[in-house]
Structures are given as structure tokens and as C-alpha cells.
Amino acid sequence: MTKSSNQFIKNTILKLLGAIGSEKEINKYIEKFSSPEQRFAVIKVGGSVVENDLENLISSLVFLNQVGLKPIILHGAGPMLSEALEEKRIDFSFINGQRVTSLEVRDVAHEVFKETNQKIVEALETQGAYAKGLVSNIFQCAIDDPDLGYVGSIQSVNIDLVNEVLESDSIPVIAPMGFQSSEMLNINADIATVELVKAINPYKAIFLSETGGIFNKTGQLIPNINLTLEYEELMAEEWLHSGMKLKLQQIKALLDYLPRTASVSITEPINLPKELFTDSGSGTLIKHGYSVAQHKIPDQETQEHFKKIIETSFRGNLVDSFFDDPGSLNIFMTSCKRATIAISNDFSVPYMDKFGVIPEAKGEGLGAGIWHEMRKVYPQVFWRSRPNNPINNFYTSICEGCQKQDEWHIFWIGISDYGAIKACIEYAINKPKSVI
């Protein structure tokens, strides 16, 4: 390895470590991902990333290599293929996010995928990470939809070849090309990634894109998606279409196949280490998720689950009088019994008395899911939080107003009348503590 390569790696590690989290957090995830029984990660790299953000991609992958982790890379090359086809004046079109592939398009696709694959492999090896390109010998396919032309429907995945590359201490770099007998076939890269993950069953499945996540109609990043609660709602949105809609459909199909605890992340290359090695992550985290139930008059069992979640989350004791008037409370709780919200209705405006997620579930998106369901029911709500509460950044990002006091920060949504806001602030300041 050259001196310049060593310096590159040193600078890369320093830059990435400083950008993510604590050493304790990083070591926790490295230990988790280093299990010999399970592959570390399948990372799908969008073609636009290779074209426009190769340096950050290679930096992040070299970092993983340096800490002893070998991801399996599957890349696309959509923008480069479209450009090559336009240069050759070859017509092409899409059906539901998939490229219609004539014989001419297929042949150009093969050349573009080979070039893109080689570009990634050479960039990795230049910086000291061994890599091997796998262009058309991983996916055995059939043609299921004649309207799409030479597009493969994956029937099986050559896991043995992938494992051989990993065991030779190299990073597999896979192109989305398949074969039927001796016939090469084009494959949508997102679909190929889903089938690869099903076959490999890694700890993590990550999609790297230039945008770094899924954004809503106002251009805001969606940090968490709970498919159980939000999938149908999202699929009905006009702003979700074409490639991103297909991607979400494929991710749902993947998570339906995997254990309920599995997740898929969409992020950008520079934030890949943060997504892997911190609880907060970066980009959009998609999980199968859990349903959320309302308990308008919480029974004894619900009260016990609520007490356990809150006391674990707040590291204190719920006051004995909390459920003295259970009819004034509306308890939201996830079906996994790891996140809860209590809304008190004993004031003129609904008051969020408690919002808790157990520490072990931090970073799983449970809080976002239960918050989403609570807001469907309560367009008006206010609450308070200690000034040092780490969730205050989230509260600040979603509230419509905030009053900061020495002991409490008071937040509200959906309240515009000044007198009502003033009354809510007074109520929140003077309300006795419910966890001691």
C-alpha cells in the first residue's frame, strides 16, 4: 500500500469518526456486525452516486474495510445508461419504473454496467481495499413480462460465488445483470438488491442515493417510515411515483419476507457510517413496524405496560396517582409494548402528559410511528419537556410554538389564540411532576 493510500485512509477514518458518534456507540455496532454467523450488509449504490459522488462513496466503503467489515455492493447505472442510449440514438421507455429493454438496449446496458462496475472496483483498490467485480453471473433469471423485453425476473442467486469473494478478503461489487441459459438479461437494480438481501440475510440493507432519503411533498426528509401504519397512505400520494414508488414497493416486499425486527435504510454515501454506527442514524429508516392502539379507558394490563415503558424511559417512578382518573386519559401504545403516549383531557386543550420509548428501541422509529398516530387524533396538543431532554430537537422541529422557562420548555401545535396559549403555558408550568 502506498504512502498516499495510507494517508487517505487515515484522513478518511478521522473525518468519518468525527462526523458520527461516540467511540462507545461505534464499537457497539462494529462488534454486532462482526458476527461470523451473519453477513454484515448489502449496500445498493445508485447510478447517480457513482457518477456524482464517487469520492464519498469510496471513503465510506474504505472506512468499513479498515474496521474489518466487508459489505456486499450492488450498483445501478441508470443515468449513465440513459446517456449512452441517447448518444447512440436508441429509443427507450419505462413501464412502472422499469426500463423496457430491447436487444439494442440490453447490449448497451451490459457495456455500461461493466464500465461502472470496473470504475467502482478500481477506485476501491486504489485506496487499498480489495474488491472483485461480478457482472453477469450472480442472478439466474427468466423472462416473465414480454412487454419489458430482455428484463430478467430473478429465479435464484449464486450465493456461493458471493461467499467465495468475501472469504478471499475482498468486497463483492455486483452489477444488475442476469442470465437465462446463455442469454444476458437486464435487471432493475432495486429488484436485484431485494432478491440479494433475501438470499444473503445480512444484518443491514442500505440504499445509497444522491438525495439521501425519501422526501415528502414539501421537500422535507421523512426520517422514519412505519409500513404497517403508513404504507397505504404513502402509496396513494401523488408525489410518490416512478422509481421511488417502485423502490418502496420492493422494500415492503423485502420486509414482508424478513423478520419483523429487520429494517432498510436510504441514505447518502457521506452519511453511511452514521447510519450504520449510531442510534440516530441518517436518512430514511424503513421498518415493517407495529400497529398502534388507543386505550381511552386504560385497563389494568395497559396501565402496567404503560408504567413499565415510562419508568424505563425516564429512569424514575411513575407517581401512584397517575391513573386515579383513567377516564381522563387516552393512552396510545405500540403493539410491541415498547412505546407509549399519554394524552390528558382534563384541560380545555389536550395535554401530552407522557411520551416514552424504552432505551432498547432507540433508533427503531417507534417514537415517530406512535407520534404520527397520535397527531391524527389530536390536531391540537401541547406538552412540556425538561431543558436538557435529548428529544427537544425533535420537538422543536415539529412544534408550531415554544416557550422556554428555566425548569420547563413548553411546546404546542394547532393553537393560535394568544389567550389559549398563555393558559396552556400556565397549566404546564404548574402541573405537578408525574415521574419522580
Located regions from the model:
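C-terminal catalytic "cap/lid" subdomain
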Residues: 2-381, 389-390, 400, 410-436
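Conserved active-site tyrosine of GNAT-family acetyltransferases
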Residues: 395
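Conserved acetyl-CoA-binding loop of GNAT-fold acetyltransferases
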Residues: 398-405
